[in-house]
Amino acid sequence: MKFGNGCWLQKEGIECFAPQEAYFVNKNDHEVVICAPTHHIAHRGDTLGGINLTIRVTAPAEGVIRVQTSHYLGVEDHSPKFDLNMDENRAMDVEETEDEIFVRSGNLSLRINKKNWSMSYERDGKVLTASSGRDLAYMRTQWTGFAYDMDPEGKAYMCQQLGIDVNEHVYGLGERFGALVRNGQSVDIWNEDGGTSTDQSYKKS
């Protein structure tokens, strides 16, 4: 699903809420939970409105870092999904400074800039990919402003974009008709498995 109208504009009725800073951080040896407001907090009046995102970082396996972003947890989830076989309490290395948070799992690390939000994924000191600006965002459709945010037709989505280098390619994303290399494509992903005689099959593109 595409939310943008080119690089600089959102589609009509779309509003983007991206984390701007880490307002406070709760951490232990198996998770980091960050409150990330979508606007900078200069004084306590800035805490009275706006949207906050909760970002949870864990390491379910060595060399793996999982980042989960949510807004308003607690609502029953009816989406199709399956349980994952992973260790929710696996220990990881966490270090926090005044400006950054470092999470390490094996030779993979995640560097988070707390003051001007950005995330950099690195292996053995080499940057693999990164996101900043509006790359990670909570998106609203049919947005009419905070004062009128009661539209039952409006929907919410989470969006994540990760940078890739020249000559890097994205493969797979399910069995679908089309080019094997997915660069530049918009691809829907779901957990349903179309059978041999269902209308889903592998025709979705």
Predicted regions and their residues:
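Catalytic and substrate-binding clefts that recognize carbohydrates or anionic sugar/phosphate headgroups
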Residues: M1-G4, E15, T47-G49, S70-Y72, ...
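A low-complexity, Ser/Thr/Gly/Pro-enriched, surface-exposed linker/loop concept
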Residues: F3-H43, G49-D99
